[in-house]
Amino acid sequence: MNTMNSVLQCKELALYGGSFDPLHKAHLAIIDQTLELLPFVKLIVLPAYQNPFKKPCFLDVQTRFKELERALRGIDRVLLSDFEIKQERAVPTIESVIYFQKLYCPKTLYLVIGADCLRHLSSWTNAKELLKRVELVVFERIGYEEIQFKGRYFPLKGIDAPISSSAIRASLGV
């Protein structure tokens, strides 16, 4: 995992946000595939304090951050950021995008999202402005409906991960 200073030398950044509640192997597969698809990018993993579209998290924010820290240790080109956590509220994606654009001035900023999020992107805060500021990287899951989106995006194909954070929480009765 990199420090903030190492990001300053990067012209391309990618943001991968989420609740990571809990972190599982599909999250890590998405990180690996993003780094493979975009070989010159630094990837910033951005755990949410609270996802604006979901119920409050099952795991507390410190636990989720520590899980990510352990899992990402030693992965080159990845930075774990606590920007959204420090806000102590649900942070719209556009706010995080603007923050990192101002902080690092990347030539290109990619936003890594799931196909399920892409279907509802129009309901996000300032969605049109968001699409002007980022290049989308969209991960599809095997067995899920094909993406119907008229805009441009980079696909991450075949995330064969039947595990989801929601399914894990449901199996625990939460």
UniProtKB/Swiss-Prot annotation:
GO molecular function, one term: ATP binding
EC number per UniProt: 2.7.7.18
Entry-linked Gene3D superfamilies: HUPs
Functional pathway: Cofactor biosynthesis; NAD(+) biosynthesis; deamido-NAD(+) from nicotinate D-ribonucleotide: step 1/1
Catalyzed reaction equations: nicotinate beta-D-ribonucleotide + ATP + H(+) = deamido-NAD(+) + diphosphate
The UniProt record lists the keyword Transferase: yes
Keywords per UniProt: ATP-binding, NAD, Nucleotide-binding, Nucleotidyltransferase, Pyridine nucleotide biosynthesis, Transferase
Keyword tRNA-binding: no
GO BP: NAD biosynthetic process
A Pfam family hit: CTP_transf_like
Disulfide bridges in this chain: none
Enzyme class name: transferase
Function noted in UniProt: Catalyzes the reversible adenylation of nicotinate mononucleotide (NaMN) to nicotinic acid adenine dinucleotide (NaAD).
HAMAP family membership: NaMN_adenylyltr
Family: Belongs to the NadD family.
Protein name, entry field: Probable nicotinate-nucleotide adenylyltransferase
Species annotation: Helicobacter pylori (strain HPAG1)
GN (gene name): nadD
